[in-house]
A protein has these predicted regions:
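Enriched for short, Lys/Arg-rich terminal
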Residues: 70-108
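Basic/aromatic recognition patch in beta-strand/loop cores that engages polyanionic ligands
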Residues: 48-83
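A general secondary-structure boundary signal
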Residues: 15-19, 67-69, 84-86
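Catalytic cores of transferase enzymes with a strong primary signal for eukaryotic protein kinases
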Residues: 14-19, 26-31, 48-51, 56, ...
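Contiguous, function-dense segments enriched for cysteine-driven chemistry
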Residues: 4, 50, 87
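Arg/Lys-rich, positively charged N-terminal/basic patches that mediate binding to nucleic acids
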Residues: 1-37
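Compact soluble domain cores
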Residues: 39-42
Length: 108
């Protein structure tokens, strides 16, 4: 199974925010490492899209979000259709699910 990968605007913004914060607080080297980890994990999803568990927040919005942990602080939130994996958000695991949904544009 090799599905097309699409990135939502909130996913791109959340990744940019994480990388910007990392550069400021920990340096460019760590930010580049995190970016490589995220991109590598996203590419692996195209071959195994159902490998990550369904997120508990799915019930709140009626959409089956899956969450792939990249490292202990970063999680890829995504959905799967017949032809596409949609990267919906790159989550700092310290962020609450409700805050994440708000940033994704869902009113809860």
């Amino acid at each position: 199974m090799n599905l097309e990968i699409r990135w939502s605007a909130p996913a791109l913004l959340s990744l940019a925010d994480i990388l910007e914060y990392t550069v400021i607080e920990h340096g460019e080297r760590l930010a580049l490492k995190i970016r490589r980890q995220v991109m590598s994990a996203v590419q692996r999803l195209s071959f195994s899209p159902f490998s990550a568990p369904v997120e508990p927040i799915s019930e709140k919005v009626g959409i089956e979000f899956r969450g792939l942990l990249v490292n202990k602080k970063i999680k890829i939130i995504y959905t799967v259709s017949d032809t596409t994996i949609s990267i919906e958000y790159i989550k700092n695991t310290y962020l609450s699910d409700l805050t994440m949904l708000e940033k994704m544009g869902y009113a809860i």
